[in-house]
């Protein structure tokens, strides 16, 4: 029996949007099983200076419910690499806006643990108006923070 090709990607996934779905479909197309690491609330606060709008467990559940995703797990509070070391993926897909690691640094860090997955940077967002959480929040503010709005 041939070993399943495991693909891992990671992100915050706060306010799911079409861009998230695009990267998940792409990641799944590269292998047999897609496991998504969802960033912890505390980690997001450290990186972005604010907690996510949607709590971590709800974000994990929503991501896991998406068709391309086989499993979603929460990231580690201690070591960003911990879930990857446990999962031992064949491929890691980085999003276009992920800056925690660049491809080379990630390869070097994982090599210290004798892990040598293929690392792929996703660059293929379709041109849709709402492929980022920030764009969605800006549009909500534009639409609902004017005086003419009647709710």
UniProtKB/Swiss-Prot annotation:
MF term (GO), any: ATP binding
A Pfam family reported for this protein in Swiss-Prot or TrEMBL: CTP_transf_like
InterPro entries found in the cross-reference section: Archaeal_FAD_synthase, Cyt_trans-like, FAD_synth_RibL, Rossmann-like_a/b/a_fold
Annotated residues for binding of ATP: 12-13, 17-20, 97, 125
Pathway: Cofactor biosynthesis; FAD biosynthesis; FAD from FMN: step 1/1
Alphabetically ordered keywords of this record: ATP-binding, FAD, Flavoprotein, FMN, Nucleotide-binding, Nucleotidyltransferase, Transferase
Family affiliation: Belongs to the archaeal FAD synthase family.
Protein name: FAD synthase
Species this protein is from: Methanocaldococcus sp. (strain FS406-22)
């Amino acid at each position: 029996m041939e070993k399943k090709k495991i693909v891992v990607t990671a992100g915050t996934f706060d306010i799911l949007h079409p861009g998230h779905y695009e990267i998940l479909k792409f990641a799944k197309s590269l292998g047999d099983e897609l496991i998504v690491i969802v960033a912890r609330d505390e980690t997001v606060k450290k990186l972005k200076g604010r907690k996510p709008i949607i709590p971590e467990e709800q974000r994990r559940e929503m991501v896991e419910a998406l068709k391309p995703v086989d499993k979603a797990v929460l990231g580690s509070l201690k070591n960003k690499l911990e879930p990857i070391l446990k999962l031992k993926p064949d491929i890691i897909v980085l999003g276009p806006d992920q800056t925690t690691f660049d491809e080379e640094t990630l390869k070097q860090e994982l090599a210290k643990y004798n892990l040598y997955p293929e690392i792929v940077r996703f660059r293929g967002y379709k041109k849709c108006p709402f492929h980022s959480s920030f764009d969605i929040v800006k549009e909500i503010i534009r639409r609902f923070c004017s005086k003419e709005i009647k709710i």
